[in-house]
A protein has these predicted regions:
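An N-terminal-biased, well-structured beta-alpha scaffold segment characteristic
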Residues: 2-106, 110
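Glycine/serine-rich phosphate-binding loop and adjoining beta1-alpha1 elements at the start
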Residues: 2, 8, 77-169, 298-300
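Rossmann-like adenosine-cofactor binding region
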Residues: 209-291
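Adenosine-phosphate binding glycine-rich loop
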Residues: 118-159, 269, 274-371
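Generic hydrophobic/aromatic pocket-lining and core-packing "Φ" positions
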Residues: 23, 47, 104, 142, ...
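Short glycine-/small-residue-rich Rossmann-like dinucleotide-binding loops
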Residues: 69, 75-76, 95-96, 221, ...
Length: 371
């Protein structure tokens, strides 16, 4: 199979779909790999590294799209890229379609085969291709939030871990999944006072077993969230409904009870955000203020650390890329129900139920669509 790796063109995105080491695995199996000129530069990979691994360097994205059977990316396709997709071409990347109606329409119209990293599952119904970037984003959320709390950034002027004789700040983490756990790892390491809200008592017990008395677990059904929001210095939004829009847990009215200069980091912004007042921002202009509350809503947080993120992502995605290249999409997906869960759009059909429901498309069962 011919596999193409274009440069990422989303604002301030420097990750790359495959590392030279991953390319080497593909070429060792007899596949051709075409990499756009300097696609890996931002993540620390040179053209020569890819050529040494057996790839060819293409001068433009158009060449990559035109000459490849499968496109492997990181972030959702931008409009210029959607226009280059063709019927039956495989696209393997993050998509987050429930929050992107225009992108979804473009992919449907292209009649390409669109497999989303974020909805591939495993035997335990976890999300193995979303988890690496969720871990990175969770860790970054505390760093970004702590920085945003500084006075020059518009924050309260508060050191999240406190100081000798000074109490630490309060961190409220919504969601005890991969984002929440990794946010708690950094927040507790910085000696903040950390609250984690989740609807699952079993998950909260797991987190308490890991963190002990360094966290305060809260069952979401048993609390008045507004009371905790009022005492929060840094709020992390890490809730997820796989493939669907995130629930709006924090309303605009709740902002009125928050402290002046407090900070919200909405990691769920890729799926529309879990805060009513969230809107996507970029690394170049990451924050805005509503009702005296700083909002940090960068939609590609892991893109700020492209070296770490690319290596972590490739460790998870490479086996699936190899499976697609070796078997083709029909055999690869038919033989693995967990992989089939990643199919979001196929030959003009929406094949992920949450996306179809959120955006008003007819849902076509993925096993039907590929056969």
């Amino acid at each position: 199979m011919k596999v193409g790796i274009p440069s990422e063109i989303k604002a301030q995105e420097s990750r790359v779909g495959l590392t030279p080491q991953s390319v080497q695995q593909l070429t060792n199996h007899g596949h051709e790999v075409l990499v756009e000129n300097n696609a890996g530069f931002g993540a620390g990979f040179e053209n020569a590294d890819y050529e040494k691994a057996g790839a060819k360097i293409a001068s433009s994205a158009a060449d990559v799209f035109n000459d490849s059977d499968m496109i492997v990316k990181v972030k959702e396709t931008q409009s210029a890229e959607v226009n280059m997709l063709r019927e039956n071409q495989i696209l393997f990347t993050y998509l987050h379609l429930s929050a992107a109606p225009e992108l979804t329409k473009g992919l449907v119209d292209s009649k390409s085969i669109c497999i989303a990293y974020e909805t591939v599952t495993d035997e335990n119904n976890r999300l193995p291709l979303l988890a690496p970037m969720s871990a990175v984003a969770g860790r970054m959320s505390i760093q970004a939030g702590a920085h945003s709390l500084e006075k020059p950034q518009g924050g309260r002027g508060l050191l999240i871990g406190g100081a000798p004789g000074v109490n630490p700040g309060n961190v409220l983490i919504l969601g005890g999944g991969v984002v929440g756990e990794n946010a708690a790892t950094i927040a507790t390491g910085m000696e903040a006072k950390v609250y984690i809200v989740d609807k699952s008592e079993a998950r909260l017990k797991e987190l308490q077993a890991k963190f002990g008395d360094r966290i305060i677990p809260l069952v979401s059904d048993d609390i008045n969230l507004e009371n905790y929001v009022a005492e929060t210095d840094l709020l992390i939004g890490g809730v997820l409904i796989p493939g669907a829009n995130a629930p709006k847990l924090i309303t605009k009215d709740m902002l009125k009870v928050m402290k002046r200069g407090s900070v919200i980091v909405d990691v769920a912004i890729d799926q529309g955000g879990c805060v009513e007042t969230s809107k996507p921002t970029t690394h170049a202009d990451p924050t805005y203020v509503i009702d005296d509350v700083v909002h940090y809503c960068v939609a590609n947080m892991p893109g700020g650390v492209p070296r770490t993120s690319t290596l972590a992502l490739n460790a998870a995605t490479l086996p699936f890329v190899l499976q697609l290249a070796q078997s083709g999409y029909r055999d690869a997906l038919n033989s693995d129900a967990n992989f089939l869960a990643g199919l979001n759009v196929c030959q003009g059909n929406v094949t992920y139920k949450a996306v179809a429901e959120d955006l008003g498309y007819n849902f076509v069962d993925p096993s039907t669509a590929i056969n």
